[in-house]
């Protein structure tokens, strides 16, 4: 599996509760915070839910 870098680029204020929980489950709390994860089908689905809030780069 490929590794990806996920960066929170926009605030979760005003978003739906399921989107907030998804951002938290990705390990992101503050704008600009970056986390690295292994790309899996589950992670791909989580990224799709919050694609307007995060920036994803393949490592």
UniProtKB/Swiss-Prot annotation:
One GO term (biological process): translation
Subunit field text: Part of the 50S ribosomal subunit.
GO cellular component, one term: cytosolic large ribosomal subunit
HAMAP family: Ribosomal_uL30_B
Family: Belongs to the universal ribosomal protein uL30 family.
Gene that this sequence comes from: rpmD
Designated name of the protein: Large ribosomal subunit protein uL30
Presence of the UniProt keyword Ribonucleoprotein in the record: yes
GO molecular function, one term: structural constituent of ribosome
PANTHER family reported for this sequence: LARGE RIBOSOMAL SUBUNIT PROTEIN UL30M, MITOCHONDRIAL RIBOSOMAL PROTEIN L30
InterPro entries according to UniProt: Ribo_uL30_ferredoxin-like_sf (IPR036919), Ribosomal_uL30_bac-type (IPR005996), Ribosomal_uL30_CS (IPR018038), Ribosomal_uL30_ferredoxin-like (IPR016082)
Keywords, comma-separated and alphabetical: Ribonucleoprotein, Ribosomal protein
UniProt cross-references to SUPFAM superfamilies, sorted A to Z: Ribosomal protein L30p/L7e
């Amino acid at each position: 599996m490929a590794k990806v870098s996920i960066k929170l680029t926009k605030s979760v204020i005003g978003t739906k509760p399921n989107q907030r929980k998804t951002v938290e489950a990705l390990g992101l709390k503050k704008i600009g915070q970056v986390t690295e994860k292994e790309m899996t089908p589950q992670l791909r689905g989580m990224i799709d839910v919050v694609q307007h809030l995060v920036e994803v780069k393949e490592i």
